[in-house]
Amino acid sequence: GLTIRAGSYADELVKTAKTIASPGRGILAMDESNATCGKRLASIGLENTEVNRQAWRTLLVTVPTLGEYISGAILFEETLYQSTTDGRKIVDVLIEQNIIPGIKVDKGLVPLAGSNDESWCQGLDGLASRSAAYYQQGARFAKWRTVVSIPNGPSALAVKEAAWGLARYAAISQDNGLVPIVEPEILLDGEHGIDRTFEVAQKVWAEVFYYLAENNVQFEGILLKPSMVTPGAESKDKASPTKVAEYTLNLLHRRIPPAVPGIMFLSGGQSEVEATLNLNAMNKSPNPWHVSFSYARALQNTALKTWGGLPENVKAAQEALLFRAKSNSLAQLGKYYGDGESEEAKKELFVKGYSY
């Protein structure tokens, strides 16, 4: 008969996933590629040098008590092997903070031949050996971001390619001890309304779970990183947090098995406050999975602007990051009331055609 080999890491994967999906905690996404990190640094007038990237990443991981609100941090490969400015391994600093190190493993988006100007995500070649090396280095979870564009269709081909790539990556990750974060980002770009987003998201998640099952991925040992269901960024319609929560939870209930331990939303260019309000609205009533956050810009933005590259601003910048982490922690518990928010935190962070 057909035997499915239980992976040697099965129990560990479940434990890792549950730890990341623990009450009041979420993920700090700090896996921007060096090029994107350079854009962040340029926005505060800094050059994109390894020293500056190291200074910024050191600021992020050394925030005192960060581990109370953050359970995992996604790193870019450079960061997984990097040390802080005072010479401690970044991985060790995270572990001391009670934060599980994760690693971005995809190799970016490239044009998908035969599609309607769409992309696919590369990085499966050599993934098994890279994953094993990342595990040795201390990583315990992985991330693979593929994208679906609504203005471009999306074509059946692009959706299938996205879903299949995610499923292969997930199987390879689990085989090497890493909990895969499954991320088919449905881009905010476009003028479409919320109903169109909902329709596309249903299609995408149906295919993703079909292929995850076909690849014998253990659902208890994965995490999801979906987009919230919102109108397109250029749409005339704006949706309240209540409406975003209603549509998004409806999608999850229809498509995501309760075996999945955690759903860690991406912010996808929402403002810091918007991302927190939407998450809070989704946690107003109990859910079958841990519904939390995996934010990059929506955790880092105010901290970056506060820092401005100046050593004397490090403490204030770290406090800004901690404030955001704490706000999202409250939102994970459904207890965020929007107190003490700055104008900077309310700024729209959407960038057209954004790439990590």
Swiss-Prot record:
SUPFAM superfamilies membership: Aldolase (SSF51569)
Question: Reaction catalysed by this chain?
Answer: beta-D-fructose 1,6-bisphosphate = D-glyceraldehyde 3-phosphate + dihydroxyacetone phosphate
Pathway entry? Carbohydrate degradation; glycolysis; D-glyceraldehyde 3-phosphate and glycerone phosphate from D-glucose: step 4/4
Top-level taxon in the UniProt lineage: Eukaryota
**Under the GO molecular function aspect, what terms does this record hold?**
fructose-bisphosphate aldolase activity
Q: Which family does it belong to?
A: Belongs to the class I fructose-bisphosphate aldolase family.
Designated name of the protein:
Fructose-bisphosphate aldolase 1, chloroplastic
Q: Which organism is it from?
A: Pisum sativum (Garden pea)
